[in-house]
Amino acid sequence: MKRLNSQLQQDGAPLELILLIRTLLAGCKEISFRVSQGALAGVLGSTLSENVQGETQKKLDVISNHILKDTLRESGYVKAISSEEEDDVVPCDPEGKYLVSFDPLDGSSNTEINSLIGTIFSITHAPQWMKPDDPSAFLQPGTQMVAAGYVLYGPSTMLALTTGRGTHIYTLDKTHGGFLLTHPNIQVPEQTSEFSINASNQRHWEPAMQAYIADLLAGKDGPRGKNFNMRWVAAMVGDIHRLLCRGGIFMYPFDNRDPSKPGKLRLLYEANPMAFLMEQAGGKAETGTGRILEVMPEEIHQRVPCIIGSKEEVDMCLSYNDNAK
């Protein structure tokens, strides 16, 4: 099987980007080990603190954030970091050429039940003019990413990665410590009969989304004329991994409970990297009003609605918005 380095070289990734990705993945391998220790190492449960999102931090949130932050700050390749667990950007090397945004442990509430969790990341070029503590440099649309991916900590530790030349999935060989290419050039099926959404929030959605989900649930007896299955992992990284492997549609739609938070998922380190992966695999990624990768961020923790997955099903979902106008 091909090693990560060989595939990155084949895809034309520059040397410094390859070295940065390897450095980031060294941190992810340490997170994978910490996660695997669980209660044996006393890393489960919550802390007494909240992050900038107002969410109670799990112990593994904090541990994972420190691992990635320390690893990247010492690398020499990164000018600054933005993280879900940090209020502000974290300055690194003034000579660094890249900016890294990450959710250190997506789905951390799943640690208590030994379910799927993962690390999501995106990488962009650092403007030469920026100071390492300047958050404005992160306010670039997702089209400017040079790499994005996630590491899934499940029965095996897997990496989904794109540098703009297709989406590849690698599996960590824990015997030798390297990521091996196991699923090259993933292509998401254009059609699907599976959907992922937290249906308990249905009353807070726009009427068009409520109508779309109602038609899916109506199955063969409804206007779609076929049965659909609902899958929900409660971790974006797990749901998107399933979509990449066998198709589907993932939705965290506009929610009218809080106008200041029109979506739940953060643009820079959740929506953008997943959108990049999905588009490079032949899928589609939208907010409901436009392409996720074209959203111009206004602040580093900005949230957006997400409709991601098999192209034809995403288009079908969006058509309900068009019909509601």
UniProtKB/Swiss-Prot annotation:
Name-wise, this protein is Fructose-1,6-bisphosphatase class 1
Q: Which Pfam families match?
A: FBPase, FBPase_C
Record has Metal-binding as a keyword: yes
Residues that bind Mg(2+) 2: 103, 106, 270
Alphabetically, the GO molecular function entries are: fructose 1,6-bisphosphate 1-phosphatase activity; magnesium ion binding
Question: Where does this protein chiefly localize?
Answer: cytoplasm
For biological process, the GO terms are: gluconeogenesis
Q: Which cofactor does it need?
A: Mg(2+)
Encoding gene (name): fbp
UniProt xrefs under PROSITE patterns: FBPASE
Annotated keywords: Carbohydrate metabolism, Cytoplasm, Hydrolase, Magnesium, Metal-binding
Q: Where in the cell is it found?
A: Cytoplasm
At which positions is substrate bound? 106-109, 198, 264
Q: Could you name the domain of life of the organism this protein comes from? A: Bacteria
Q: Which organism is it from?
A: Alteromonas mediterranea (strain DSM 17117 / CIP 110805 / LMG 28347 / Deep ecotype)
Q: Which residues form the signal peptide?
A: none
What Enzyme Commission number(s) appear in the record?
A: 3.1.3.11
Q: Which reaction does it catalyse?
A: beta-D-fructose 1,6-bisphosphate + H2O = beta-D-fructose 6-phosphate + phosphate
